[in-house]
Curated annotation (Swiss-Prot):
Protein residues bound to ATP: 43-50, 161-164, 190, 198-201
Annotated catalytic residues: H50 (proton donor)
Encoding gene, per UniProt annotation: panC
Lineage, top ranks: Bacteria, Bacillati, Actinomycetota, Actinomycetes, Mycobacteriales
Annotated protein name in UniProt: Pantothenate synthetase
Protein species of origin: Mycolicibacterium smegmatis (strain ATCC 700084 / mc(2)155) (Mycobacterium smegmatis)
Disulfide pairings: none
Pathway: Cofactor biosynthesis; (R)-pantothenate biosynthesis; (R)-pantothenate from (R)-pantoate and beta-alanine: step 1/1
Amino acid sequence: MTISRTPKFSAGELNVYSAPADVAAVTRALRTAGRRIVLVPTMGALHEGHLTLVRAAKRTPGAVVVVSIFVNPLQFGPNEDLNAYPRTLEDDLTALRAEGVEIVFTPTGSDMYPDGTRTSVHPGPLGDDLEGSSRPGHFAGVLTVVLKLFSIVRPDRAYFGEKDYQQLTLLRQMVADLNVDVQIVGVPTVRESDGLALSSRNRYLDKDQREQAGALSAALLAGKYAAAGGAEAALDAARAVLDEVPALEVDYLQVRDPMLGPAPAEGQARLLVAARLGRTRLIDNIAIDVGASAGIDGHPRVGNDQNHELPWRN
């Protein structure tokens, strides 16, 4: 008879597991001991944005933070180079150790998909919109791997950045539609001093492109302040900023409601942009208030609304 034993776990230290069965056994034992499991899924190449998610997760009382590092092949399209995605595992582990993370899950493709990809999660119509229109199959790959991570780790909460707002919305849709008992927590976008959203892709920008990339966040901020005049006013203001940078090839610039349905005539909304600089594709978004819900002075409302981040510059 084979007696299964829980893999070793050292509290207060960084524990790295690659086998799904091992991390599942450890998190199950921790839950039995009364600890809460919180998950931060990543593809590695960690930057301050990822570490902000980790810090938010660590604020959960009684939590053990699990960070997964897995470059998921399912979310790469035929024209996207999976092999070119940056892999910096040793640097990532050093950063996570400094943050006090106790569990890192680093599976391989064969660990996650031992029998191939026979089953996947269909994201519905929203999965083919916005990002999905230029990256077919991307969100099916994202939802499939995240659902697998949920099944393996069994977290109480999972933390995701608002920079990938469509992804965040689809994950909330998935857990609601499939009755997945995990709370999805969105964390505001982390930005450079000029407003550029942190992204692993920023490393591909040369000096000139890095300067030009600041136009995305500037356009969003212009749209935010113009939104009192309606969705079209927000788009016009944002477009005027983007047009000043001919090197930017804009894929889309849209206003949507918070669940990414059609733009509202009035109320809370999201302004989203995607553009290319050379071979690098960048995305960003910002919460806006459309129409009469904006302040009477024409500036966006600022208050206790947890869905809205403050402007990052005046």
